[in-house]
Amino acid sequence: MARKIIYWISTVIVAGSLLAALTYLTGNEQVVSGFNKAGYPQTLRIVLGIAKPAAAIVLLLPGLALLKEWAYAGAAIAWGMALITHYTGGDGPKVWGMVLMLLVLLVVSYVTRPSSRRLTPVSPSVAVQAKQWMGSDSKP
């Protein structure tokens, strides 16, 4: 039960932060200047303004295991780059610490997610059949 509570708390916080990226689409002066300061093109702001909220929705919906893997990976890459950008840009720990906290919550959400929200691994027999079909098991 505790694992389920930890999962939902971390996931809701992560999803809320990802949904907040909708502000990237408004052309908010603070967001635009932040992307400019980092040297990133404004088109990245638009892409993230669409991708992050989409990831939030996928994380909250049941099923969609493969899309969830992509959502977790995309959020990790985006926040990893944000962490590096803020740290190397001279922003203080108040700024990059928040991004680091979101990355930790993302990992907690990923690790504690229920089996119904995980990608089912390929069975070994399928992998063996694929190797045989591709000819990698053939003897010289």
Positions of predicted regions on the chain:
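Membrane-interface extramembranous regions
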Residues: 1-140
